[in-house]
Amino acid sequence: MSLHIQGTERTPEVQLMTDPLSLKIQGESFPEDVAVFYGPVITAVNALSLAPKGPLNVSLAMVYINSSSIKALYRIFEGVDAYRKTGNQVSVHWNVPEDDDIMEELGEDFKDRFPELDFKVGHHG
C-alpha cells in the first residue's frame, strides 16, 4: 500500500512506499484537524504488520510540530514498533536542522520511548 500526501504550509509531506518499504515525513506539522490528516497515515502504518514485506526505513525531517501532531507521531511509532515485532528490521532516522535543540530533544524523547527501534537522531544542513 503506497500513500503520498503533498505537504502544505501547515502539513508535512508524507510518503509511504512499498518497494523498498519506507516512510518519509518532512516539513511543518500543525494541521487544523490532526485526526483527519494523520488518520490515513496511522491506518497505513498499522496495516504493514498484517502483511510484512521486509526491512522498513523511516525518515523524519520536521521543521515545526505542534503538541497534537506529536501525539499522532507517537501513534505512528507504535505502528512502526508493531511492525518490528513481526520480525522485520526497522531503522528510524530523525533528521534535525542545525541548532534546533527542541527538535533534537523531541527526537531523543521518541528514541527513549521506543528503545527497541534502531533510532538515530542527527543533524542535516
Task: Give residue spans per PLM region.
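STAS-typified acidic loop motif
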Residues: 2-39
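Structural motif
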Residues: 22, 56-57
